[in-house]
């Protein structure tokens, strides 16, 4: 009797310690998020503001003091970064508060309310991954732009002798974005703690299935975050870069004209294909992830059985996507070799040494720098293929194994 009482009391103590640890982690997450939003708002704002020395050195007039902030291209990056940090950071804080309330609200531990408490945990984990992925990719997009600012000097030539201001600001912001990866990495670490807590609350025979759900949901979330980046990039390309990409081809040969016109069409196809692929994949994989959660929560054998043909069909679709992604990577490689390709044809046509359509070459360099997102897209597809293959094997085992037959209904 004494051993039973001591065993129960030790479990209560361990439970309290776990709650205190989780509470501390979530409070630390909230504090870290607030620091990230505020700190990087002021740092980025500092580097897009002109100092007194800059105003004197470059003879900046009163109406030009917001030169960097008012520039449409700079505005697209630094403002988007701060907005995303504020929006996603706020939601991360709210999710932490929801998790804190649900863990200490005793009524949620009774009967059917426990089911809803666990669902809150799953949905919260899903949304946390989404906001972290968007913040990470937004930071990466800004890093790609500001760290390659020297390639985009053509866009700032209208400012006469003030292009150095854009270069200096870009180089400083490049360093800022290199360091700011630390915070999304911390958020991901906190999210992994939430995952581990949920993982050990799942019945042992379903833990592998839950791990697969987590990775499957992660790939769906990454597709959704990539959709946001490609949609934003397409809007930037259509509404802002189109104003800068003005040139005439009257003095050039027909082969060069064909290359340039074909490349412009390719840019639109590139975005359209990626947008359709990412949003459709995100929806399908997230829905399949929630189907997995239903299976785990209900310990439903029939759902596991249904999941087997679904996994096979999804693997076929993902494999076709993998083949399609090779076309995307090939297109990206062409954008990166575009200037060299133009130069070869220019020499063949014995054209002048004057640079052909510099605005178009600068724009295509910008497309080339999107290749990092293409590699993330390709890696995500490869991960999906592996994870759905694993899901097929695990579901097959849980359905037909005699060991787990009594544990599923």
From Swiss-Prot:
- Give GO cellular component annotations, separated by semicolons: plasma membrane
- Residues on the membrane's Extracellular side span 41-83, 140-179, 231-272, 325-380
UniProt topology in membrane: Multi-pass membrane protein
UniProt keywords (A-Z) are: Cell membrane, Glycoprotein, Membrane, Transmembrane, Transmembrane helix
Q: Principal place where this protein is found?
A: membrane
As recorded in UniProt, coiled-coil segments are: none
Q: Which residues are glycosylated?
A: 161, 178, 360, 380
Q: Which residues lie on this side of the membrane: Cytoplasmic?
A: 1-19, 105-118, 201-209, 294-303, 402-409
**How does a null allele present?**
Repeated attempts to generate a knockout failed. Conditional knockdown results in the arrest of parasite development at the trophozoite stage. Early arrest of gametocyte development.
User: Which residue windows are transmembrane per the record?
Assistant: 20-40, 84-104, 119-139, 180-200, 210-230, 273-293, 304-324, 381-401
The listed locations are: Cell membrane
Q: What does this protein do?
A: Orphan transporter. Required for parasite growth. Required for early gametocytogenesis.
Q: What is this protein called?
A: Plasma membrane resident transporter 1
Source organism of this protein record:
Plasmodium falciparum (isolate 3D7)
Q: What's the source species' lineage?
A: Eukaryota, Sar, Alveolata, Apicomplexa, Aconoidasida
Recorded name of the encoding gene: PMRT1
